[in-house]
Design a protein with these regions (language model features):
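Catalytic cores of large soluble enzymes that bind and process phosphate-bearing ligands
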Residues: 1-8, 28-35, 39, 92-95
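N-terminal hydrophobic or amphipathic helices/low-complexity stretches enriched
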Residues: 1-25
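General structural feature for long, well-ordered alpha-helical segments within catalytic domains
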Residues: 5-12, 35, 39, 43, ...
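Structural signal for hydrophobic packing residues in well-ordered secondary-structure cores
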Residues: 13, 17-20, 50-54, 104-111
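A non-catalytic alpha/beta surface segment that caps or lines the substrate-entry region
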Residues: 21-67
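Catalytic-core environment of secreted peptidases
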Residues: 49-50, 62-92, 100
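Fold-independent oxyanion-binding glycine-rich loops
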Residues: 58, 80-82, 123
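Alpha-helical metal-binding/catalytic segments enriched in His/Glu/Asp
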Residues: 78, 88-123
Length: 123
């Protein structure tokens, strides 16, 4: 399992970090900037391709949802922000959103639908 997550992170973290990358090695994705919006759209595509229902709320937060089989009204939410400060690092908030998505995707693949709904949020 650890090998799976290491490989998944090594493959997806550089991809996610490429949005808003700056020449000094950091990235800049200020809230509601074109870079932030592009990141949200691309992350939405990835979550949808993995079988999650995706949606944006009225302020732009992105959700990826896997409905529960027994208690769908009970929701477990995990994630983080994907905006950055100027020249931010790639292990800032985006890692929390990415880790939540990778964990839900792995659990879905291994065990199928959860009893309770699980949701990823990228803010």
């Amino acid at each position: 399992m650890i090998t799976h997550f290491r490989q998944a992170i090594e493959e997806t973290l550089p991809w996610l970090s490429s949005f808003g990358a700056d020449p000094t090695g950091g990235m800049t994705r200020l809230l509601y900037s074109p870079e932030w919006l592009e990141t949200q759209q691309q992350f939405k595509k990835r979550m949808a391709a993995s079988g999650l229902e995706t949606r944006f709320d009225e302020v732009g937060n992105l959700y990826g949802r896997l409905n529960g089989s027994e208690y769908p009204q009970e929701v477990i939410l995990s994630g983080s922000h994907i905006d950055t400060v100027v020249n931010g690092g790639n292990l800032d908030g985006q890692f929390g959103a990415l880790a939540a998505w990778l964990a839900i995707d792995w659990l879905k693949t291994q065990y199928g639908a959860p009893l309770r709904t699980v949701e990823v949020v990228a803010m």
